[in-house]
Amino acid sequence: MIPTTRNKLIVLAGFACLFYFMSYRGRPDSSTLKKYKKINNRFPTIPSCYLLPYDKGQLSDISEYSIRPNTTFFLETSCRHDRGLSLNIRQSCAFESAARAHPGTEILVLFPAPVSMRNPPPHVKMLLKFSNLKFFHVDVERFFQGTPIKSIDFIEMMDKSAFAPSQASDILRLTTLWKYGGTALDSDFVVLKSLYEKRNYIGQETKHSFSTAALNIDIHTEIGKLVIEEMLKDVQANPDLAMKYGDQMGTALATRVLRKICKEEHASDMTDEKCGGFHVLPASPESPLYPIGLEWEFFTRKNQDKKRFEKLKKDAWAVHMLGRESVRTSIKVGTDVFYEALAAEFCPSVRSTVKDYF
């Protein structure tokens, strides 16, 4: 049977539709996203603020930047920066300390909501002097393309979340490491030395729990790719399960994935060998990331435990202020507590701008 012109056109149309469908997959569904773009311009909230138009003259988009090896990332997921970059002092100290500890690599701070760089406060002006410390926008409609997470699923999860800033940070952190590798940190650390003594690691905040507040992934290794891929796939496959853990979502994901990979129930039994070369770093007091565990009040002391403080500075890579707890405690300048001593040594530029309280 000889194909008619009409049949040929039908076949061609079918191929065209198939090509369109295949090329469109993975792109944001703009028609679906429209309902999240109903913005209260005075008081934008997550996730709507992530879909606001942003001024490329203020910050470039991270997807257009060539990421270097051993980059350290921070995620700032609040909506409060559109009228000026309102980073607090402790965040700024975290960024400066990371920049000082890694002079040969880059520290990138990522913002999914619009940011205005006009008239920054003095402590932010200090940060802008570091050539290896840079701020970037994250276009969430673009950022998730080609990853195990779909942008619309991320937006819908954040719309339902009672812990949106924390959970957005967790998902964006994992996706960033899936795309680029490197180290991702919460902004309540003070970094004391290089975070690249090892590759592919997570820390134990206590003897019974992991923390993704600091996570290193080398995507050029099989185990690094496996761990981060499994964590993102877990989010995509079980969004409701991930959401129920609130601000502990990252910890819950890491626990489930590492139990599966290491075939052990308890973190203390997860050796490098059992985990295929992935490092589960020890808990306090041996931890290089959480040397005081959950005892954040330690940093509000000054004379007690001086030997412990000096040992911590000598041995640890970084210290965690446990921001969700310590944020309610102000530290007065001039009290000479341990946090102020850390700030004077590891973020002196930011420290020099502080007049009253950290």
What are these regions (language model features)?
Residues 171-182:
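Small-residue hinge/turn detector
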